[in-house]
């Protein structure tokens, strides 16, 4: 969780769909706590934090596209991760096809068009300690290229914060 606007989006979704934030199994992709995490959103949860780098809020060290637990999750959440994941298309597909149960919710935030590169050796390496050689802003078009949103989700919403250059999404899997 990198800035206030992301919290506003997550709290908007929580208010809209509160049943996904209490007594649920949660998987957080890109969970390393660099400047906050997503646990505060949930009550009475079972939570697994997945990241490629060990540290606070990380339970399993794995790439998002390679993580294949034996259970499906009620909620998969990811904040400010996909722009640092060179395999983000495969990660998105793994989340929807493997990690998320039917009827479960996927929620994410990521950098989109206009955001300055961050978390690389050229910019601010501490912002993404394990992926300093890759960065790409992700657009709604990129997500729709990776996933057939209409076929995968019964309900969904994209939003863009043009001031912070964030892409926001939540969807309820069919």
Task: For each feature predicted by the language model, list its residue ranges.
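Short beta->alpha junction loops/turns
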Residues: 2, 81-84
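Conserved N-terminal segment of class I S-adenosyl-L-methionine
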Residues: 1-71, 75, 133-136, 140-147, ...
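Redox-cofactor binding/interface segments in oxidoreductases and associated redox assembly factors
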Residues: 28, 78, 108
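A short glycine-/small-residue-rich loop at the edge of a beta-strand within enzyme catalytic domains
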Residues: 47, 83, 101
């Amino acid at each position: 969780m990198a800035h206030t606007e992301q919290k506003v989006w997550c709290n908007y979704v929580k208010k809209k769909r509160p049943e996904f934030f209490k007594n649920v199994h949660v998987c957080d992709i890109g969970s390393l706590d660099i400047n906050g995490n997503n646990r505060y959103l949930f009550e009475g949860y079972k939570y697994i934090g997945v990241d490629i780098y060990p540290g606070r809020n990380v339970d399993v060290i794995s790439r998002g596209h390679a993580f294949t637990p034996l259970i499906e999750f009620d909620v998969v959440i990811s904040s400010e991760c996909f722009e640092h994941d060179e395999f983000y298309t495969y990660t998105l597909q793994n989340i929807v096809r493997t990690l998320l149960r039917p009827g479960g919710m996927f929620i994410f935030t990521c950098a989109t068009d206009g955001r300055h590169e961050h978390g690389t050796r050229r910019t601010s390496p501490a912002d993404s300690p394990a992926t300093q050689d890759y960065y790409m802003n992700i657009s709604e078009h990129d997500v729709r290229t990776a996933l057939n949103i209409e076929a995968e989700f019964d309900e969904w919403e994209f939003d863009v914060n043009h001031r912070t250059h964030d892409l926001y999404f939540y969807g309820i899997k069919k």
